[in-house]
């Protein structure tokens, strides 16, 4: 049984910590800062960091990789088509890799960056570590990719089993939900989610992980084929958007300025 906890970093990052109590081995996802991981290891001296999983090359996701590799000798996994510090295993779409006894499938999900990958573990309760591609009620900015690429990447993730747990890497949920409410003010599920997320953050509690089912009902970037979302995008752009990709592009540009 793998336990998953979040180690906060910077202002709003989460470094996901996977723990196998049987072997006393652990793994981390996107350690942008080594210090939170080093502190956890110091508090748990009988545990060993065996793997470091990286989704993309941005500094707030890889800044701690080299130091942790030097400290622990952990294996570093990352996208083949990006420059990842101290990488041991370069991963491409469709490959499978075993971490702490779990087999993860690699998805290439370009958009936020061109080489971005996600790690998916199919199980009774599937796990998805998706970096800055899919957020709770949102998606990543398009620093390198196109709207069409990101739309395709999100559609791929949206097709995963509804109970898939979504481990993204930023506490952006409330700001994303405010935008989602601007897009769909009459979405009852969205209003309920906003109220719940507000209660959690007022108690300084994490709003993650999410689930694919929740994203399908409340994330505007996964709802670009819904009439209510298309109508709002048409109003925003002043023209008829004929494809889901066009609707997505309007929403992403709007969110960038929201």
Curated annotation (Swiss-Prot):
CDD domains: hydroxyacylglutathione_hydrolase_MBL-fold (cd07723). Zn(2+) 1 binds at residues 56, 58, 112, 132. Gene3D superfamilies: Ribonuclease Z/Hydroxyacylglutathione hydrolase-like. Zn(2+) 2 binds at residues 60-61, 132, 170. It catalyses: an S-(2-hydroxyacyl)glutathione + H2O = a 2-hydroxy carboxylate + glutathione + H(+). SMART domains: Lactamase_B (SM00849). One of its GO terms (molecular function) is hydroxyacylglutathione hydrolase activity. InterPro entries: Clx_II_MBL, Glyoxalase_II_hydrolase, HAGH_C, Hydroxyacylglutathione_Hdrlase, Metallo-B-lactamas, RibonucZ/Hydroxyglut_hydro. Its EC number is 3.1.2.6. Its cofactor is Zn(2+). Keywords: Hydrolase, Metal-binding, Zinc. Pathway: Secondary metabolite metabolism; methylglyoxal degradation; (R)-lactate from methylglyoxal: step 2/2. Binds 2 Zn(2+) ions per subunit. Pfam families: HAGH_C, Lactamase_B. GO terms for biological process: methylglyoxal catabolic process to D-lactate via S-lactoyl-glutathione. Thiolesterase that catalyzes the hydrolysis of S-D-lactoyl-glutathione to form glutathione and D-lactic acid. HAMAP family: Glyoxalase_2. Monomer. Belongs to the metallo-beta-lactamase superfamily. Glyoxalase II family. This is Hydroxyacylglutathione hydrolase. The gene is gloB.
């Amino acid at each position: 049984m793998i336990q998953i906890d979040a180690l906060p970093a910077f202002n709003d990052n989460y470094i996901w910590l996977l723990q196998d109590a049987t072997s006393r081995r652990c793994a981390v996802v996107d350690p942008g800062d080594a210090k939170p991981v080093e502190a956890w290891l110091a508090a748990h001296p009988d545990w060993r960091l065996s793997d470091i999983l990286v989704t993309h090359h941005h500094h707030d996701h890889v800044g701690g990789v080299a130091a942790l590799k030097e400290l622990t000798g952990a294996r570093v996994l990352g996208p083949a088509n990006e420059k990842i510090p101290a990488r041991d295993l370069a991963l491409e779409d469709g490959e499978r890799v075993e971490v702490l006894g779990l087999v993860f499938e690699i998805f290439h999900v370009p958009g936020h960056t061109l080489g971005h990958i996600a790690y998916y573990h199919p199980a009774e309760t599937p796990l998805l570590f998706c970096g800055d591609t899919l957020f709770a009620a949102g998606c990543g900015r398009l620093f390198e990719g196109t709207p069409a690429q990101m739309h395709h990447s999100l559609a791929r993730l949206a097709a995963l089993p509804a109970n898939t747990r979504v481990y993204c890497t930023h506490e952006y949920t409330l700001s994303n939900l405010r935008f989602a409410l601007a897009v769909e003010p009459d979405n009852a599920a969205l209003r309920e989610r906003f109220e719940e997320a507000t209660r959690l953050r007022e108690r300084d509690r994490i709003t993650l992980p999410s689930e694919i089912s929740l994203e399908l009902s409340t994330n505007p970037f996964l709802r670009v084929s819904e009439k209510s979302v298309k109508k709002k995008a048409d109003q925003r752009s002043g023209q008829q958007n004929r494809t889901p990709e066009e609707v997505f592009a309007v929403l992403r540009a709007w969110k960038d300025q929201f």
